[in-house]
């Protein structure tokens, strides 16, 4: 499975990558292969009970199942680096913060679903958390999104403080924070020709200067967002703080229920 799915057809993409917030997670450029050394309960194809999308993404779903199985069991097979660094899996899926001390039920609390994010007739694979009060898939949150381009490819992934939500209006929204004074809300179109498959549409972000003056800025348009120098104050972009935060609240409340299946269900289908 290769990672590094989406690219930009313009030079500004590199500018965007260099100006991400500290929490933003880039896509690792590595190649990994399915570990078939041990039977972890999934991997033997039972295609008759699997959907077309589950068959299409089976290679990456198998890898996530293996990682989650090992983590939940607490076996010697569980090694964060083995799955996150060597195989390039999304850390918030195989190693969520709420499982650090108690991984019981991990296979039932991590889920996946399929959704056509750009209307091209092919569904993407979305992975995230099931249930709970913090960023569940039922509220539209996804911590990893894969596309198909001959094989499954990781488009983008989130973190606990850099979260992606699939809006009911077809947009992808990101909410991020690197402290009380630095927050962002960003609106994207899902577009495979852009870096991380995300075309910037609209951005709200907060800043604070050395004199503790705090403000929000609002930027519209991919060219303007990607060329932005975020450590500077731009008077033309400054907006009312209440307006910025209220808009961010509306965006992050617009998630569509992704109706996830968990990995126990996946294992049963795989046989």
Question: Where do the PLM segments sit?
Answer:
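Ser/Thr-rich, Proline-interspersed low-complexity disordered segments
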Residues: 13-33
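C-terminal motif of bacterial Sec signal peptides marking the signal peptidase cleavage site
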Residues: 4-5
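Beta-propeller fold detector
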Residues: 154-159, 198-202
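Acidic, small-residue rich beta-repeat scaffolds with periodic aromatic anchors
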Residues: 33-82, 169-271
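Beta-propeller blade repeat segments, especially FG-GAP/WD-type strand-to-loop junctions
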Residues: 138-156, 188-190
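Beta-propeller blade termini
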Residues: 108-117, 161-171
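Short glycine/acidic-enriched loop and turn motifs that connect beta-strands
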Residues: 131-135, 179-180
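Acidic/hydrophobic-patterned starts of short beta strands in beta-sheet-rich repeat architectures
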Residues: 118-129, 170-173
């Amino acid at each position: 499975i290769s990672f590094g799915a989406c690219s930009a057809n313009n030079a500004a993409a590199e500018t965007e990558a260099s100006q991400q917030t500290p929490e933003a997670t880039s896509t690792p450029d590595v190649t990994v292969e399915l570990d078939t050394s041990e039977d972890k309960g999934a991997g033997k194809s039972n295609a008759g009970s699997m959907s077309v999308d589950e068959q299409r993404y089976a290679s990456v779903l198998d890898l996530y199942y293996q990682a989650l199985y090992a983590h939940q069991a607490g076996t010697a097979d569980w090694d964060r680096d083995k799955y996150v660094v060597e195989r390039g899996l999304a850390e918030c899926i195989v190693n969520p913060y709420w499982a650090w001390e108690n991984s019981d039920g991990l296979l039932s609390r991590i889920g996946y679903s399929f959704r056509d994010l750009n209307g091209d007739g092919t569904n993407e694979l979305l992975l995230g958390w099931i249930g709970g009060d913090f960023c569940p898939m039922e509220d539209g949150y996804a911590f990893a999104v894969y596309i198909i381009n001959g094989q499954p490819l990781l488009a983008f992934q989130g973190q606990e403080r850099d979260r992606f939500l699939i809006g009911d209006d077809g947009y992808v929204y990101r909410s991020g924070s690197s402290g009380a004074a630095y927050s962002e809300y960003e609106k994207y179109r899902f577009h495979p020709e852009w870096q991380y498959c995300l075309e910037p549409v609209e951005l709200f972000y907060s800043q604070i200067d050395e004199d503790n003056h705090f403000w929000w800025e609002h930027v519209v348009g991919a060219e303007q967002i990607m060329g932005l120098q975020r450590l500077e104050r731009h008077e033309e972009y400054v907006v009312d703080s209440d307006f910025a935060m209220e808009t961010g609240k509306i965006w992050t409340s617009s998630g569509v229920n992704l109706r996830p299946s968990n990995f126990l269900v996946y294992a049963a289908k795989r046989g």
